[in-house]
């Protein structure tokens, strides 16, 4: 009788271990999501750096916060916290000569990707760097973060 319970316990333990262990498909999914996030961030940066952007100097006056050390997916919480101010600055910069296409859609995509990548962890508190960043430095910082994480996955 105990033998059957022991075998059942072992079988359940093995099932739990195999289901919770990261698989190559989950790594591939994470990599794809990071690549999409990277492309969205680069698209925003390219739109801002567009030489026809008459509001660039105004956009550079707004300051953003970067984490002291972003090395894990949970640090995407810090990006999520800055998305609303980022969207507001991008909306202020819209003009008839300069228009970031689909800004709201890009920010929405970034938000969805960040939520999926960082998981449901909400107890993480960001430690921000003491120095603030311009919008260009902010986007470059997160682009570098994505590239760094992608390189560890490949």
From Swiss-Prot:
GO terms for cellular component: extracellular space. The keyword Disulfide bond applies. Belongs to the IL-2 family. This is Interleukin-2. GO terms for biological process: adaptive immune response. It is found in: Secreted. It comes from Saimiri sciureus. Glycans are attached at residue 23. The keyword Disulfide bond applies. InterPro entries: 4_helix_cytokine-like_core (IPR009079), IL-2 (IPR000779), IL-2_CS (IPR030477). GO terms for molecular function: cytokine activity; growth factor activity; interleukin-2 receptor binding. Cytokine produced by activated CD4-positive helper T-cells and to a lesser extend activated CD8-positive T-cells and natural killer (NK) cells that plays pivotal roles in the immune response and tolerance. Binds to a receptor complex composed of either the high-affinity trimeric IL-2R (IL2RA/CD25, IL2RB/CD122 and IL2RG/CD132) or the low-affinity dimeric IL-2R (IL2RB and IL2RG). Interaction with the receptor leads to oligomerization and conformation changes in the IL-2R subunits resulting in downstream signaling starting with phosphorylation of JAK1 and JAK3. Keywords: Adaptive immunity, Cytokine, Disulfide bond, Glycoprotein, Growth factor, Immunity, Secreted, Signal. The gene is IL2. Disulfide bonds join 78-126. Residues 1-20 form the signal peptide.
């Amino acid at each position: 009788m105990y033998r059957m319970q022991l075998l059942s316990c072992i079988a359940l333990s093995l099932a739990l271990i195999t289901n919770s262990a990261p698989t190559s498909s989950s790594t591939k999914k994470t990599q794809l999501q990071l690549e999409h996030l990277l492309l969205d961030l680069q698209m925003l940066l390219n739109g801002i750096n567009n030489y026809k952007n008459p509001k660039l100097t105004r956009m550079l006056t707004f300051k953003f916060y970067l984490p002291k050390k972003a090395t894990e997916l949970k640090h995407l919480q810090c990006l999520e916290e800055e998305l609303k101010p980022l969207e507001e600055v991008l909306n202020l910069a819209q003009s008839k000569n300069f228009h970031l296409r689909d800004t709201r859609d890009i920010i929405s995509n970034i938000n969805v990707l960040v939520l999926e990548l960082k998981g449901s962890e909400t107890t993480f508190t960001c430690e921000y760097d003491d120095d603030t960043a311009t919008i260009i430095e902010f986007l470059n910082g997160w682009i570098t973060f994505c590239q760094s994480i992608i390189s560890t996955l490949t």
